[in-house]
């Protein structure tokens, strides 16, 4: 596995969940995610923090908490109100890296979702 950096977009391998998959509006693995943990944690820890990406649709629209990002020219929504911890072994392939302004929008969305302002 290569160097994992904040702002990278990685595919996160699906985790088997006993009794089924997600419940309600949960987002889970088996999809791309943006690494949001800082680079020091990314180098030293076996776990990283991610924000999963999803396709825009009627239920999930872009807003201050869930900004739009572009990965390989495709529009996705960063689901910032569902930050997840992921073991590095689940990161299967690096897809891209978000633009600086997109990472800033994600960080702002997390701060709003967690009331860190």
List the model feature ranges, each with a label.
Residues 1-117:
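Conserved functional hotspots at enzyme active or ligand-binding sites that engage polyanionic ligands
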